[in-house]
Amino acid sequence: MIFYNSLSGQKEQFKPIEANKIKMYACGVTVYDDCHIGHARTYIAFDVINRYFKYRGYDVTLVRNITDIDDKIIKRANENGESTTELVERNIKAMHDVFARLNILKPSKEPRATETIPEMVAMIETLIKKGYAYQGANGDVFYRVTKFADYGKLSKQNLEALQQGSRVDVVEEKENPMDFVLWKMAKEGEPAWDSPWGAGRPGWHIECSAMSKKLLGDTFDIHAGGSDLRFPHHENEIAQSEACNECTFANYWLHSGMVKVNAEKMSKSLNNFFTIVEVLEEYHPEVVRYFLASTVYRSEINYSKENLENAKASVERLFNALRDIEPIEVNLPDDASEYEEKFIKAMDNDFNTPEALAVLFSLAKEINTLKTTNKYKASGYAYLLRKLCDVLGILFTDIEEYFKQGDGVDASEIEKLIAERTQAKKDKNYARADEIRNQLQQQGIILEDSATGTTWKKG
C-alpha cells in the first residue's frame, strides 16, 4: 500500500509502527457552528480510508478530537446570549447527527479539548523548561519558533520567508511575530482553568498535541486533516510535539482537498456557503456521500448541481444493479476475485476512489447482464458489490427505501392512497382501486400485491 505523505511530498510505502495496527489522529471540528460541506468532504475522505484499512485487516485506532474551547466558540456564545457549554453541546449533537446520516463511522476515541487541560499544561511546562516557550509581559505563554530548527518542514517554507510574508497580528509581548500562543490569560467572563501562569485557557495548537500524545503516544502512524490546516496548525503541532517529546510526531501526514462551489472558493462572504443540513434537504445522504467520495481524497472537489445530479445518477445505477437480486456469498463465481483484486489495486495506490468506483460499475454491469440468464452467478456478484460498496461506505440505505425518497415523492401520501385502495378492494369498489393504481403508476410508483399486503417502489 502506498499513499502520498505530505511530510515528504511524495508517495511512500506504508509501514506501520506495529504490525497490523494503525494509530491515526484526525483533527476534528471546532464546534461553534453547524458543520458545512467542507467538513463532510474531510471526514468522509478519512472515513473511507479508515474503512479501507479495516477491510485490509488492520486494527485501527482512530482518534478524532472535538475543539470545545476556542475564541470563535466564546464569541458565538456571547452573540447568542448563551453559555459556551450550551453552544458546544448543541453543536456536538448536531455534528453527530449529520455524520451518522452520512454513514461516517464513529472514531475509536473522541476526546474534547477541555478534558485534556492537565496534559496541555504539562506539555507547556516542559516546553518552557527546554527553552521552547516563554511567558510574555501580559502573562500569555508563547512558543519560540526560532528555537525549533525544523519549523516549516511540513509546509515546505523556511522561517525567514514566513516572517517576511507574515500577516500574523503583531503582539508586543512576542519575541517574534511568528511565535504562537500556548496559553492565554483569562479575560473577565470567559471560561478559565488554573495553571502555573495564572487562570486561563489553552491555545488551539497545543490542544491537538496533548490529545494525540495522551491517546496515541509520542509517535504514531498517521496524522490527518484538511489541507487548510497544514499551515499553521499542523506545522505548529509538529514544533510543539517534537520539541517536547524529542522524537518524530507522526510518520505520515494525509491532507484532504478543499471544496469549491461552482469553481469558486466556498465562503460566507461569497454567499456560496452550505451547511450539511442544507445540502441534505435537497439531496439524499447516499448522493452526498457518493459525490464527496468520488474524487481522490487530496484533490479539490467542485460542488455544483451538475456534479450532484451526476452522483445521483451513479448511485441509482448501483442500486438498480442490486434490485430484485439477493446477494449470496456462497454463489461467488471463481472469477470474482479479479474484480476484488482490481479494487484493491486502485485503493492501494493512494486510495484512488475513482478507479475503485469504476470496478464497482463493471460489477454492476455484469450483474445486470446475468440477472436474466444466470441468477445464481448474479447473486454471487451482488454479494461482492455489496461488500466493496461497504468499504467505501456507500449504498447503506435499504434499496426500496432509497427509491421511495426524493423527486417530490411524498411517502405518507402514497401510503394513504394504498390504504384507500385496500379498503376499496374490500368494498368491491374495483374501479376506484384501479384508479388509484393508475394514478400512482403515472407518478412512477409501482404497486406489488401479495398475501401480506401491498408494497410500493419507484419504477
From Swiss-Prot:
A cellular component term, taken from the record's GO annotations: cytosol
Motif 'KMSKS' region, residue numbers:
265-269
Its Enzyme Commission number(s) read 6.1.1.16
**What are the transmembrane regions?**
none
Q: Which residues bind ATP?
A: 268
Q: How does it assemble?
A: Monomer.
What PANTHER family does the record tag this protein with?
CYSTEINE--TRNA LIGASE, CYTOPLASMIC (PTHR10890:SF3), CYSTEINYL-TRNA SYNTHETASE (PTHR10890)
Name the family the entry cites: Belongs to the class-I aminoacyl-tRNA synthetase family.
The molecule here is called Cysteine--tRNA ligase
Q: What is the lineage of its organism?
A: Bacteria, Pseudomonadati, Pseudomonadota, Gammaproteobacteria, Thiotrichales
The gene behind this protein is cysS
